[in-house]
């Protein structure tokens, strides 16, 4: 699912991180630099 700026401000289900590219995931690639929501 898309999230963040690319997804109309949507957040990710299940507490997943929103990457700088606007996609949901749980790895540092998503949760690290540039993360848009649910960041760790």
Curated annotation (Swiss-Prot):
A Pfam family hit: Chitin_bind_1
Keywords, in A-Z order: Antibiotic, Antimicrobial, Chitin-binding, Disulfide bond, Fungicide, Plant defense
SUPFAM superfamilies per record: Plant lectins/antimicrobial peptides (SSF57016)
GO biological process assignments: defense response to bacterium; defense response to fungus; killing of cells of another organism
Keyword field contains Disulfide bond: yes
Family matches, as InterPro entries: Chitin-bd_1, Chitin-binding_1_CS, Endochitinase-like_sf
Domain named Chitin-binding type-1: residues: 1-40
GO molecular function, one term: chitin binding
The protein, known as: Antimicrobial peptide 2
